[in-house]
Amino acid sequence: MANWTQLGLQDASSPLMEELIYFHDYTLIILTLITILVFYGLASLLFSSNTNRFFLEGQGLETVWTIIPAVILIFIALPSLQLLYLMDEVNNPYLTIKAIGHQWYWSYEYADYRELEFDSYMIPTSDLTSGNPRLLEVDNRLTLPAQTPIRVLVSSADVLHSWAIPSLGIKMDAVPGRLNQVNFFISRCGLFYGQCSEICGANHSFMPIVIESVNFSTFETWVSNFITE
């Protein structure tokens, strides 16, 4: 979850988010160097008296400023393509969840277990207990095992929604009449917060997502208790 005065991205809680942060930092370094070079060129042009006013063409210079940007784009595109393929990779998920967006709450179905489904509503500010984040806590958290390949099928029962967990590097649109798939691997136990990231009506800001990641034995106990209840 993001904290006050936090300027960077949230701490990565999945291998995919780690790769996204590496790519962000790598691209930022390249953009910083380009910005410094451009400002240096502008400063040299403005404050130098050695400008040749009759300089009409320069084949060598034109070749350089064509090749160098092309090389820079290649160095940005290759890691980006690798990430795109990594996002779509399916590694035999152990658990499949179906997340359905509604106005304005989420419902979850555990496809591998019978009668394991529930709705998840935001807890109003007046009902929050001490320590719970405002507009982010829900009455029923999505409980998932850590260190386990997971697949989530995302859809919608009414309008467009988007199921997004920033610390896991996940954002998948929920489209009525269509199933979209997202795969992830949670690296550690903890609470991970997200929100609907597609404007879906008056209460768009009030349909948060909370994943509670636990170890596998705790998850099996939770499943057994939920079904018996």
UniProtKB/Swiss-Prot annotation:
Residues 1-26, 83-229 are mitochondrial intermembrane. It is found in: Mitochondrion inner membrane. Cu cation A2 binds at C196, E198, C200, H204. It is an enzyme of class 7 (translocase). PANTHER family: CYTOCHROME C OXIDASE SUBUNIT 2, CYTOCHROME C OXIDASE, SUBUNIT II. Component of the cytochrome c oxidase, the last enzyme in the mitochondrial electron transport chain which drives oxidative phosphorylation. The respiratory chain contains 3 multisubunit complexes succinate dehydrogenase (complex II, CII), ubiquinol-cytochrome c oxidoreductase (cytochrome b-c1 complex, complex III, CIII) and cytochrome c oxidase (complex IV, CIV), that cooperate to transfer electrons derived from NADH and succinate to molecular oxygen, creating an electrochemical gradient over the inner membrane that drives transmembrane transport and the ATP synthase. This is Cytochrome c oxidase subunit 2.
